[in-house]
Amino acid sequence: MLRTIFLLSAFLLNGIAFSQPGVFIRFTSANTMFPDTARANGHDYSGKHYDALTHYNDSSVLIYVPKNFSPKGSPNLIFWFHGWSNNIDTAYRQYELVSQFEASGRNAILVFPEGPKDAPDSYGGKLEQPAVFQALAKDVVQQLENRKILRRRRSFNINDYDITLAGHSGAYRVISRILNKTPVHEVILFDAMYGGNEYYLEWLSNPEHRFVNIYTKNGGTFDNSRQIAKLITDSLNVPVISVDEPAVNAQLLQSNRKVFIFSEQTHNGVITYHNNWALFLRNTPAR
C-alpha cells in the first residue's frame, strides 16, 4: 500500500525548511529500485560493507509540481536518478534541482525515485526489470490524479505521457536499462556516460530522440562520451553536435537533438554551473 505525505510550499522536510512555490508529494511505492533481492545482503565496495537495511530499503518517491504547471496535452514526467553516495533529499538540495526546475519554466512534473541510498553503487534494482518502470509511472500518475493535479483517465497507458529520464554520475545504469523498455523521448546526462553503450546506441538511433550529455575531463566519462558521439555519426548516421561548454546557448540547444558538451567544471559542478539543468530543460527542439 502506498503511504503518502502531502507537502505544500513553505514545508518542513528532514528538519530543514524550504519555501518553493510549487507542490511536493512524498510517497512510497513497491515499484521503486529497492528493496531488491540482489541487494538483500547489502553490497561491498572498496573494502566496506553497505548493509541492506540502511542503504537498500528505502522505497520513497518525491514529486515536485511547479507553480505554473498546466495539465494540457501529454503531461511531461521527468524522472531524476541520483548518483553515488547520495539520496533523493541530499541530491535535490546539493544540485539545486528543484529551484532550477522551477526557474526553467518547463511545463512538467519532476519525479525523484530513491536509489542506492548513500552508497557507491550504480545498480538500478527492480527498475532494471522490464515492466517495473511503467508500474512506477502508474503509481506517480495515481498520486497526481488523487490530488487533481492530473485529470483522471479511465485506465493508465504510458503512451499518454511524455517521459524524460535524467541523472548524474552512476545514474547511467538505471537509465540505460529503462530507455528501450518504455517510450522515452528525452535523456539528459550529467557526467554519467560510463557505460551501457549498447542500450544508449539503440535508443540514440532514433533521430527524434533528444539527448544531452555533458561530460568532464576527470569524471571518468571523457573517452566514452567521445566514442559514443563518433559512433552516432559514423555507425548510426544520426546528426550530432559536439561542443565545448562556452559555446552552449539557447539557439544551439533548440536546434540540435543530439548534443555532447565538454565541460571544464568538476564532476559535481556541471549541474549547477550557469544553471545548466535549467538551461537544458528550458531550451528544447521543436517537436
Region spans (language model):
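Active-site nucleophile loop of the alpha/beta-hydrolase fold
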Residues: 115, 188-196, 216-220
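Alpha-helical scaffolding within the catalytic cores
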Residues: 92-101, 194-205, 245-247
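Gly/Ser-rich "nucleophile elbow"/oxyanion-hole loop immediately N-terminal to the catalytic nucleophile
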Residues: 125-169
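A domain-start/cap signature at the N-terminus of enzymes
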Residues: 19-77, 108, 239-248, 256
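Sec-dependent N-terminal signal peptides
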Residues: 4-13
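Active-site machinery of serine-nucleophile hydrolases
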Residues: 74-77, 81-144
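Primarily recognizes the serine-hydrolase "nucleophile elbow" in alpha/beta-hydrolase
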Residues: 158-206
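C-terminal catalytic histidine-bearing segment of alpha/beta-hydrolase fold enzymes
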Residues: 216-287
